[in-house]
Amino acid sequence: MKKVLLLAFCAAAMLTVQAQPTVTNSWTKSQTDILSVANVNNSNPVAVSAQGDMYATGLFTESFTFGGKEIEAVATSSYLLKYGTDGAEKWGVALTGAATIKTITTDGAGNVYIAGNFADELTFGSTDGNTQVKEGIKMDGTPIADQAAGFVAKDDVNGVLKAVQSFVSKPLPELEATGIYFPEAGDYRFDINNIAYSDGKLYASASYKGLTENNGFSFKGGYFDLDVW
C-alpha cells in the first residue's frame, strides 16, 4: 500500500511540473502621468479578441497621446485602447466625464463591448468623430456627483461607436406618492457588474435600487434587488 501511494504521489508531482509551460513576454506597454497616485486603479478590465488584439481600459485625469491621437480628459474620465497582436497602438477613445469602465468583452468579429457607471454628463468617443452624450441621475434637476447611472457601449474593430445604452434610475413612484419620502444620493442606482457575448447576444448582470426604465423594460428594485437580463 505504501508503494502504491508513493507512486501515485510522484506521478501527480510530475504532472504538476509538466503542466507549467514557459511563458515568454511578447510585449509590454504602459501609460504614465495620466492619473494621480492616490487614484490609481490596479484592476482595470482588459480583453483579448479572437483575432489576438488586446483592448485595455483605465482611468485618467491628464491628456495623453495614443496611436498618434490625443486622448483628452474631463474630470476622472475613462479610456478604451486597442493594441495589435504585436503591441502596436491601433486606436483609442475616451469616455469624457466622470465614468468608470467595470467590465469588457468582445465578439467573434472583434467588436468590443464595455459597461460601467457614470455621473453627470458623459460623452462617448468614436474614432469617426460621431460621439454620443448621455446624462446621468439628477436630483431636483441637478446632476449628482455619484457615479450611479449605468451604461453599455459597443465599438467596432476600428473604434467607431456603434451603440450606447444608459440606465438611469429614479425613486420608486409609490414611495414618492407617500409625501414623506425624500430621496438622497445613493437611494437609487444601476450597477452593471459583468457582460458576456454568446450566440449573437450580449448578456449582462446588474444590481439596482429604485426604478430604471430602458427600451420598454422596467427594473424595479425595492431597495436592493439582483437581476440578470
Residue ranges and their predicted role:
Residues 20-229:
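A sequence-level/structural motif corresponding to short, flexible coil/turn segments enriched
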Residues 1-25:
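Bacterial Sec-dependent N-terminal signal peptides
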